[in-house]
């Protein structure tokens, strides 16, 4: 295969939420048989057809960087992890739909990846909000993915989906909820597959085709993160 242009997408979230299983499913179209904890960072690649079905269609490599660890790690660990955050073109934020804490921690993960000094714990502002204006120069596309959808009891699903909708609004990102052990959640033509393709197209456009900075939506165009949506039971 001829050499392809590539983009770098971080896959962030707490340990145990299913990032490795998700990346394996996205890149190999197979269920990961024996997932293990990621130490440091693991990278896998998938081929994506940008603007598929149009005259502008072009194949790109999508590098998916599965970053291990936790947001509560010591500063030395965060500093080491910061090397993975260089030259990022997109971020997939992954949380466990059965674990509200993993959803709350996505705010800290995003700040760690996007802050220049990699010390997000120092930029919490009043009323429990994170100030997006501190990242005004960033225009990194985000995608929110909730895992273990199959493990949510039927009588709890509406509450969980309401919570993820607030998350999606906070991050100004589309959301996908799935079960990483079931490839049908990402079947071709499904709404999830369309959202995923749209996200990768956006990442590629920002990296290769956007030249006018005024067209790049910054964090100042979006409202602040609001923890109320996550702390309410």
Curated annotation (Swiss-Prot):
Alphabetized, the UniProt keywords read: GTP-binding, Nucleotide-binding
Q: Which Pfam families does UniProt cross-reference here?
A: Roc (PF08477)
GO MF entry, a single one: protein homodimerization activity
SUPFAM superfamilies in UniProt:
P-loop containing nucleoside triphosphate hydrolases
Report the InterPro entries cross-referenced here.
Answer: P-loop_NTPase (IPR027417)
Q: So where does GTP get bound?
A: 16-21, 148-150, 179-180
Q: Which GO terms describe its cellular component?
A: endomembrane system
Q: Which SMART domains match?
A: RAB (SM00175)
Coiled coil located at which positions? none
GO BP annotations listed = B cell differentiation; intracellular protein transport; natural killer cell differentiation; regulation of protein lipidation; regulation of Ras protein signal transduction; T cell differentiation in thymus
User: Which parts of this chain are annotated as the region Small GTPase-like?
Assistant: 1-233
Assembly mode: Homodimer.
Name the family the entry cites.
Belongs to the small GTPase superfamily. Rab family.
Q: What does this protein do?
A: Required for KRAS signaling regulation and modulation of cell proliferation. Regulator of KRAS prenylation, and probably prenylation of other small GTPases. Required for lymphocyte development and function. Not required for myeloid cell development.
PANTHER family registered for this protein in UniProt: DRAB5-RELATED (PTHR24073)
What's the name of the protein? Rab-like protein 3
What is the native source organism of this protein? Danio rerio (Zebrafish)
Q: Which gene encodes it?
A: rabl3
């Amino acid at each position: 295969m001829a050499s392809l242009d590539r983009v770098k997408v971080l896959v962030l979230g707490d340990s145990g939420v299913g990032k490795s299983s998700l990346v394996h499913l996205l890149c190999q179209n197979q269920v990961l048989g024996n997932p293990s904890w990621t130490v440091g960072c693991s990278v896998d690649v998938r081929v994506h057809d940008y603007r598929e079905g149009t005259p502008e269609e072009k194949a790109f490599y999508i590098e998916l960087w599965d970053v291990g660890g936790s947001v509560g790690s010591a500063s030395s660990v965060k500093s080491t992890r910061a090397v993975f955050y260089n030259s990022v073109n997109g971020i997939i934020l992954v949380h466990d739909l059965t674990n509200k804490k993993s959803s709350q921690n996505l705010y800290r993960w995003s700040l760690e990846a996007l802050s220049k000094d990699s010390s997000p714990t120092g930029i919490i502002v009043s009323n429990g909000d994170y100030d997006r204006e501190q990242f005004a120069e960033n225009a990194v596309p985000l995608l929110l993915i909730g895992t273990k959808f199959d493990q949510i009891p039927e009588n709890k699903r509406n509450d969980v989906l309401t919570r993820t909708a607030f998350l999606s609004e906070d991050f100004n990102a589309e959301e996908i909820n799935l079960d990483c052990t079931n490839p049908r959640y990402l079947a071709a033509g499904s709404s999830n597959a369309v959202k995923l393709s749209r996200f990768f197209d956006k990442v590629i456009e920002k990296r290769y085709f956007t030249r006018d900075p005024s067209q790049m939506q910054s964090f100042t165009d979006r409202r602040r993160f609001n923890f109320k949506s996550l702390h309410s039971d």
